[in-house]
Regions:
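The canonical Cys-X-X-Cys-His
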Residues: 71, 75-85, 138, 153-157
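Sec-dependent N-terminal signal peptides
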Residues: 10-23, 89
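N-terminal signal peptide c-region/cleavage motif recognized by signal peptidases
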Residues: 26-28
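Gly/Gly-Pro-rich "capping" loops immediately C-terminal to redox-active cysteine motifs
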Residues: 68-72, 84, 88-127, 137
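N-terminal secretory signal peptides that target proteins for export/translocation
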Residues: 1-12
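Axial heme c-ligation environment in periplasmic c-type cytochrome domains
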Residues: 32-40, 90-99, 125-161
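Electrostatic cytochrome c docking/interface patches
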Residues: 33, 37-74
Length: 164
C-alpha cells in the first residue's frame, strides 16, 4: 500500500502530465492559425475558360514551371495550415504528395484512368470541401480560388509527389 505522500506525489505528476499534454494539444491546434483563404495571383498563367476542366492543363507544356511557382505560393498560403509546409503533412490532414501515388505502379491505360479519377476527386474536394457529421474537415474554396489557382496548386503537388 502506498503512503499518503506517495499517493500525493503520483497525483501531482498526473496533474502535471495532464496540464502539459493539454498545452501541447492546444498549441498544435492553434499553431496552424485561422483558415481565412488568401488570394492567389494567377495573372502570369494562361487563363482558362469558365468551364471547369477535367484534366490539369498545367501538368505539361510551357506553363508548367510557372504553375509550380504560383501553386507553391497558393498552397503555402491556403493549404499548408493543415497539409503542412511544402506539402509535407504533419499528420493533421492527408499528405497530398501521396494523393495519386498508387496510380504509378499501374499499366499505362489504367494509370491514365487512375490519375483522372484522383484529379476529379481533388477538384471536387477543393471546390466543395469536406464535412462529416456536421464538422468541417476542409473548407470549400469554390468561388474563392479560381480554376487557374486550383490547377496550379495541383501542379505544385505533382512536382512534390512521393511514393514513400
Amino acid at each position: 500500500m502506498y503512503s499518503l505522500s506517495q499517493r500525493l506525489s503520483v497525483a501531482g505528476w498526473s496533474r502535471v502530465f495532464t496540464t502539459v499534454a493539454g498545452m501541447v494539444l492546444t498549441c498544435a491546434a492553434l499553431g496552424h492559425g485561422n483558415v481565412t483563404p488568401q488570394p492567389v495571383d494567377t495573372h502570369t498563367l494562361p487563363q482558362l475558360s469558365s468551364d471547369w476542366l477535367t484534366d490539369n492543363p498545367y501538368s505539361t507544356g510551357s506553363a508548367t514551371q510557372e504553375a509550380i511557382r504560383v501553386g507553391s505560393s497558393g498552397f503555402n498560403q491556403n493549404c499548408a495550415r493543415c497539409h503542412g509546409l511544402e506539402a509535407i503533412s504533419g499528420g493533421i490532414a492527408p499528405d497530398l504528395r501521396r494523393l495519386d501515388a498508387e496510380c504509378f505502379d499501374m499499366e499505362e491505360s489504367a494509370r491514365a484512368d487512375c490519375v483522372k479519377t484522383f484529379q476529379a476527386y481533388f477538384i471536387g474536394t477543393v471546390r466543395g470541401g469536406r464535412t462529416r457529421d456536421g464538422r468541417v474537415y476542409m473548407p470549400p474554396f469554390d468561388g474563392i480560388l479560381n480554376q487557374e489557382a486550383i490547377w496550379a496548386i495541383k501542379t505544385y503537388l505533382e512536382s512534390r509527389r512521393t511514393r514513400e
